Regions:
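Short, well-structured N-terminal submotif of metal-dependent ribonuclease cores
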Residues: 1-40, 53-66, 131-133
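Acidic, PIN/NYN-like endoribonuclease modules and their adjacent C-terminal/linker elements
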Residues: 1-3, 106, 110-141
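A generic structural signal for short hydrophobic patches within well-formed alpha-helices
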Residues: 11, 45, 124-125
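Active-site neighborhoods of divalent-metal-dependent phosphate/nucleic-acid chemistry enzymes
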Residues: 75-117, 122
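Short amphipathic alpha-helical interaction patches enriched in hydrophobic/aromatic residues
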Residues: 12-15, 52, 72-73, 90-94
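General small-molecule cofactor/ligand-binding pocket signal
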Residues: 39, 76, 138-140
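Short active-site oxyanion
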Residues: 34-38, 72-74, 113-115
Length: 141
């Protein structure tokens, strides 16, 4: 099975049982996480830690950090080439408010040839890539 990129919103939903997307995130993690199909970036890891710490407290953030040390999710580092590509993405989509994390995620997904994302961020539905922007990520829920 192809790998799935996991975005911040999915990690947060998994950590917060009160989140409206908790059950969806939990289901995907249970099925695909055991198969070793989940991938994220170091930028998403840090953004998620900060979000969980701000909303759920330091204890929950440490719990998330510990869980990320397992083999359930593979974390890839954003490279300088990814950063250059991310900047090009931000420039070529002036009508969209893609965050730095979104742009680096898109660049990393393209580099790793990942077509699927577990994301609740609408930007993953909007972004198109390929020679004529004919390709879209498939959102897994």
């Amino acid at each position: 099975m192809p790998a799935i990129f996991v975005d911040t919103g999915a990690f947060y939903a998994l950590a917060d049982i009160g989140d409206r997307n908790h059950s969806v995130a939990k289901s995907v993690f249970e099925v695909r996480g055991m198969a070793g199909d989940l991938v994220t970036s170091d930028y998403v890891f840090v953004e998620t830690w900060c979000l969980i710490r701000a909303r759920l407290g330091r204890g929950a953030a440490i719990q998330y950090w510990d869980a990320m040390q397992s083999d359930v999710v593979t974390t890839h580092g954003v490279t300088t080439k990814d950063l250059s590509q991310a900047r090009a993405i931000a420039s070529s989509w002036p009508d969209q408010d893609f965050s730095l994390i979104d742009c680096t995620s898109f660049a990393l997904m393209e580099r790793l040839r990942l077509d699927e994302a577990l994301a609740f961020d609408n930007h993953f539905r909007i972004y198109r890539y390929g020679l004529r922007r004919e390709r879209a990520f498939r959102i897994v829920h």
